[in-house]
């Protein structure tokens, strides 16, 4: 998904680079301070996206990277859709991102952990809704699946490395909680 997102950005970047070039240049100094709240800096309809898009995109990317490591197939369809739907926002802001990173490091560092700690799902869902409304349903489904998968991941990780007897003990309780898991992990243990 990473490469698809960047490929899409790179394809669009030369286009937006040309008609953005002078604009970005002459507003570099004027807007470097007020950039977060300057609507004309960004071609997007609403005044917020220049800061929100990058801020939330950063959150979104970090979360996607974490989730991706755990279950790639689950993530793939959503990433592709979101990358396609989101590409216009990040790529239009690409020229501005140097300003953004310098203008926003503090809000980003404070807001991100705050948002991600209490409920990553809510943060991602909000981000997804704002950045690519069409894929909200897909995102919501994938997020629910992610939650299940993340809940099921620990027993899964425990089962294969240990001997069948040990893994049966260590997994007995999680299996009671996770009906979905119990069938497959018991099969694995008895097969092993």
From Swiss-Prot:
Q: Which GO terms describe its biological process?
A: segmentation
Would the keyword Transport turn up in this protein's UniProt record? no
Q: What family does the database annotate? A: Belongs to the hunchback C2H2-type zinc-finger protein family.
The organism's lineage is: Eukaryota, Metazoa, Ecdysozoa, Arthropoda, Hexapoda
Question: Where in the cell?
Answer: Nucleus
Superkingdom, taxonomy of origin: Eukaryota
Keywords from the named record: Developmental protein, DNA-binding, Gap protein, Metal-binding, Nucleus, Repeat, Zinc, Zinc-finger
Q: Which Gene Ontology cellular-component terms appear in the entry?
A: nucleus
Which stretches of sequence are listed as region Disordered?
16-54, 152-192
Q: What is this protein called?
A: Protein hunchback
Role summary = Gap class segmentation protein that controls development of head structures.
Name the Gene Ontology molecular function terms of this record: DNA binding; zinc ion binding
Basic and acidic residues: which segments have biased composition? 173-192
* Low complexity bias: start-end ranges: 32-41
Which intervals carry biased composition (Basic residues)?
A: 17-28
């Amino acid at each position: 998904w990473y490469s698809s997102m960047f490929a899409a950005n790179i394809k669009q970047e030369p286009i937006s680079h040309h008609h953005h070039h002078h604009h970005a240049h002459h507003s570099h100094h004027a807007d470097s301070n007020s950039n977060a709240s300057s609507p004309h800096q960004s071609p997007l309809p609403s005044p917020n996206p220049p800061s929100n898009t990058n801020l939330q995109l950063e959150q979104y990317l970090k979360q996607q990277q974490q989730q991706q490591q755990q279950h790639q197939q689950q993530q793939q369809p959503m990433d592709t859709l979101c990358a396609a739907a989101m590409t216009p926002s990040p790529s239009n802001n690409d020229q501005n991102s140097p300003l953004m990173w310098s203008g926003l490091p503090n809000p980003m560092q404070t807001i991100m952990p705050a948002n991600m700690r209490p409920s990553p799902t809510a943060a991602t869902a909000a981000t997804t809704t704002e950045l690519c409304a069409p894929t909200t349903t897909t995102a919501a489904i994938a997020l629910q699946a992610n939650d299940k998968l993340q809940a099921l991941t620990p027993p899964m990780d425990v089962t294969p490395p240990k001997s069948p007897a040990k893994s049966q003990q260590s997994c007995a309780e999680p299996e009671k909680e996770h009906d979905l898991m119990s069938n497959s992990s018991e099969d694995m243990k008895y097969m092993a």
